[in-house]
């Protein structure tokens, strides 16, 4: 029996006791809710940016009373690979911390260098060191000279607290789980909701987790793509806004709203990853990362005192060589005066990615029978206008 349970955990399969099936869940656009004016990419995902890959490892095991160090387990890891061989072909990058009650390791080097040279990993708070170890082991396997005749590395690992549903003291995400997520990362459609690092997350008093979206600019504006991936674990129910409608205040009666906060819930956190194929440098990507915070605000967040809101942006348009052979190397650079369409696209895609995390998440029962209810899609759509916004040109 123990062997079978262990196999289920390693396989990352969701048990029926812990989460409802995804059947019937829909992305917000499939509910008829159109966010913003720009069109999404073919997948409406961060993987619409060429070369970007995403992988998950979902861990769920046990139910009932919390046994610290044993379970129940409702957690996982999500990885974003900016491009193949990112160690030798680094990507320009920038970051922004909206509120720092949390951690994203490796940001000091990103800020200093202006580039990113390894995959990004998302997980729960107490699992950060083990996940960092997994990223390092995977990188050393790919590049055996790391730390010997080559540089060392400081992985980028971002956390949100899933302890309201998960046995966080158990630190159940292993080195092998991280390596499996990296090995399985793909450039296709991205699983959303109760998956990977989002397995135990709660957002706006509903089940949250992983969400993604993208925007494709017109050829006149450069034809660039912006993709967003979030791990949503933030906000209180009365704050939730969907496409300008105060859904959180309308969803429940005042008494129900007072009970919507899950026992042990903290102020929460959100991690936002921005990817683009527009030729931006680290300074411009930091500016883009700041604008993602506006998309977060459009869903109702005010970045509360205890919230950890971290944003990392990178561009795949240029290659920063590992060891340049010459003193200089070429980089294409978009003029700042042409940033506005990318700014608008980033805000829109961030807003939609957060909403996708909510509408794709499934109800989860976690430790001590704490229950995170998925937002009711019928109730949600009943609160929204039947007519979508007019399709107008945001840059006439």
List PLM regions with ranges.
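Generic alpha-helix initiation/capping and coil-helix boundary signal
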Residues: 1-4, 350
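Signal peptide processing junction and immediate N-terminal pro/mature segment
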Residues: 13-21
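Alpha/propeptide regions of enzymes that mature by internal proteolysis
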Residues: 20-396
């Amino acid at each position: 029996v123990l062997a079978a349970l262990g196999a289920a955990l390693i396989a990352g399969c969701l048990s029926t006791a812990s989460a409802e099936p995804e059947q019937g869940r829909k992305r917000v656009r499939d509910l008829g809710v159109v966010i913003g004016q720009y069109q999404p990419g073919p997948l409406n995902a961060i993987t619409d940016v060429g070369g970007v890959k995403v992988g998950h490892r979902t861990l769920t095991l046990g139910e009932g009373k919390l046994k610290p160090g044993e379970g129940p387990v409702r957690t996982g890891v999500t990885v974003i690979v900016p491009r193949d061989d990112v160690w030798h072909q680094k990507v320009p990058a920038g970051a922004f911390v909206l509120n720092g009650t949390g951690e994203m390791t490796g940001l000091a080097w990103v800020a200093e260098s202006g580039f990113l040279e390894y995959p990004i990993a998302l997980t729960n708070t107490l699992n950060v060191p083990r996940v960092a170890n997994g990223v390092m082991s995977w990188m050393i396997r790919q590049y055996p000279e790391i730390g010997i005749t080559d540089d060392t590395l400081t992985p980028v690992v971002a956390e949100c607290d899933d302890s309201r549903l998960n046995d966080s003291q158990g630190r159940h995400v292993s080195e092998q789980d991280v390596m499996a997520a990296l090995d399985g990362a793909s450039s296709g459609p991205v699983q959303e909701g109760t998956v990977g690092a989002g397995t135990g997350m709660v957002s706006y008093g509903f089940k949250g987790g992983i969400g993604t979206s993208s925007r494709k600019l017109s050829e006149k504006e450069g034809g660039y793509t912006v993709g967003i991936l979030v791990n949503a674990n933030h906000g209180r129910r009365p704050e939730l806004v969907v496409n300008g409608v105060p859904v959180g205040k309308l969803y429940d009666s005042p008494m129900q709203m007072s009970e919507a906060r899950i026992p042990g819930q903290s102020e929460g956190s959100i991690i936002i990853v921005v990817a683009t194929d527009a030729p931006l440098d680290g300074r411009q990507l930091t500016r883009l990362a700041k604008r993602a915070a506006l998309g977060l605000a459009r869903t109702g967040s005010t970045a509360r005192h205890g919230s950890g809101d971290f944003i990392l942006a990178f561009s795949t348009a240029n290659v920063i060589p590992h060891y340049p052979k010459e003193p200089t190397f070429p980089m294409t650079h978009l003029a700042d005066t042409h940033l506005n369409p990318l700014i608008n696209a980033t805000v829109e895609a961030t807003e939609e990615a957060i909403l996708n995390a909510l509408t794709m998440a499934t109800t989860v029962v976690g430790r001590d029978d704490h229950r995170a209810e998925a937002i009711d899609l019928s109730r949600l759509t009943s609160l929204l206008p039947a007519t979508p916004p007019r399709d107008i040109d945001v840059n006439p």
